[in-house]
C-alpha cells in the first residue's frame, strides 16, 4: 500500500512525530467591585468555567475588589493590554457616546424584562462601538433597579433640591441638575468617604451598590424607584481575543453566553437579596410616591429628548425598535 504524505500527517509521523501541544493561554481579568458583589462573582465564575472547560488550556487569573485596578482605570488598561479582560460600566465610561448611556435614561426601562429587551435591541450597535475602541464584548449583566439613598424620606423631586447627589455617569449628572441638586462625581470605591465628608448627601444607585458601600452607615432610606437598570460589560482586548486559536475563542464565547444568561436570570433574586441586606441593617425601604414617579418621568422625557438629538436617526431607530418590541 502506498504511504502518502496525508497518511503520515494523520499518524503523527511527518516531520519527526506529533506536533507539540499548543501553548497555554494565561490572561488576567480585573473587576473593581467588592469580592462579594454579584458582578465580581459572575466574572470569577466565568474565569473558573473557562479553565475547567478548556482543561487548563486557558487560564484567566481573576482580580476582584479593585486590588489590581480601580474602576476608572480598567477601560484604558484593557485597551493597552495591561489586562486581557475587564469589567466596565458602560454608562460611566461612555466618553460622550450616547449609545452607551441609553440604559441609564430614567423611566425608559423600569423592569427586568424591559431592560433585557432594551439590551437585545442595542447589542449589535454597542458591540460595533466597542470594537472600534479595541474591545470585544464577551457578556454583559444588569445592576438591580436604581433607587434613591437618603437620610430623609423622599416624596417628590422637590425633596432633592439643594442636596448633593452622587453620580458617576453623565445621565446621572443631568438628573441631578434637573432635580435642582448639585452633582457630586464620586467613583464607587469612594462613596462612603464622600458621604462622611459631606461631599454627597443623596445617591441614585442600585440596592447592590448600597450593599457594596454599606449605605446604612450614611443613609436611613432607600426609595425603590427602579428608574433604570444599567449594565456592566465584560470585555476582552480585541487584539488578545483575535490572537487566540478559533476553538479557544469559541469556548470563551460559549462560557460568556452562559454567564450572561445567569446574570439576567438571577437579577430579581440579586435585587431582593440586596434589599433584604439593607433592611436588615435598619434602613427603611419605601416605594416611590406617585408624585416622585411623575417627576422622574418628566425628567426622563427631557433627558431622552436630549439623547435623541445627540444620537440622531440611528438612535431613533433603536428606540423605535425597543418600543415596538
Protein language model features and the residues they cover:
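N-terminal secretory/targeting leader peptides
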Residues: 2-3, 7-114, 126, 130-325
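A gly/proline- and charged-residue-enriched helix-loop-helix capping module
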Residues: 114-121
Amino acid at each position: 500500500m502506498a504511504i502518502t504524505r496525508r497518511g503520515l500527517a494523520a499518524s503523527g509521523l511527518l516531520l519527526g512525530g506529533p506536533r507539540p501541544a499548543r501553548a497555554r493561554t494565561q490572561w488576567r481579568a480585573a473587576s473593581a467591585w467588592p469580592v462579594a458583589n454579584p458582578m465580581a462573582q459572575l466574572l470569577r465564575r466565568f474565569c473558573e468555567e473557562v479553565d475547567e472547560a478548556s482543561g487548563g488550556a486557558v487560564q484567566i487569573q481573576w482580580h476582584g475588589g479593585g486590588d489590581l485596578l480601580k474602576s476608572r482605570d480598567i477601560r484604558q488598561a484593557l485597551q493597552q493590554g495591561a489586562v486581557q479582560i475587564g469589567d466596565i460600566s458602560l454608562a460611566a465610561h461612555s466618553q460622550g457616546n450616547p449609545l452607551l448611556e441609553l440604559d441609564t435614561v430614567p423611566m425608559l426601562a423600569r423592569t427586568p424584562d424591559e431592560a433585557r429587551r432594551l439590551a437585545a435591541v442595542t447589542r449589535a450597535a454597542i458591540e460595533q462601538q466597542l470594537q472600534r475602541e479595541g474591545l470585544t464584548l464577551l457578556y454583559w449583566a444588569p445592576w438591580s433597579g436604581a433607587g434613591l439613598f437618603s437620610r430623609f424620606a423622599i416624596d417628590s423631586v422637590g425633596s432633592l433640591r439643594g442636596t448633593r447627589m452622587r453620580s458617576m455617569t453623565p445621565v446621572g449628572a443631568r438628573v441631578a441638575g434637573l432635580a435642582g441638586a448639585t452633582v457630586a462625581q464620586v467613583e464607587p470605591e469612594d462613596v462612603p468617604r464622600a458621604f462622611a465628608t459631606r461631599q454627597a448627601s443623596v445617591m441614585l444607585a442600585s440596592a447592590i451598590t448600597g450593599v457594596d458601600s454599606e449605605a446604612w452607615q450614611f443613609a436611613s432610606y432607600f426609595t425603590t424607584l427602579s428608574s433604570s437598570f444599567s449594565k456592566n460589560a465584560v470585555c476582552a482586548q480585541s487584539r488578545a481575543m483575535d490572537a487566540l486559536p478559533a476553538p479557544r475563542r469559541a469556548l470563551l464565547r460559549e462560557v460568556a453566553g452562559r454567564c450572561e444568561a445567569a446574570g439576567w436570570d438571577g437579577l430579581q433574586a440579586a435585587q431582593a437579596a440586596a434589599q433584604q441586606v439593607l433592611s436588615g441593617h435598619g434602613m427603611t425601604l419605601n416605594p416611590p410616591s406617585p408624585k416622585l414617579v411623575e417627576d422622574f418621568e418628566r425628567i426622563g422625557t427631557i433627558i431622552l429628548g436630549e439623547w435623541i438629538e445627540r444620537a440622531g436617526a440611528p438612535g431613533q431607530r433603536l428606540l423605535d425598535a425597543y418600543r415596538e418590541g
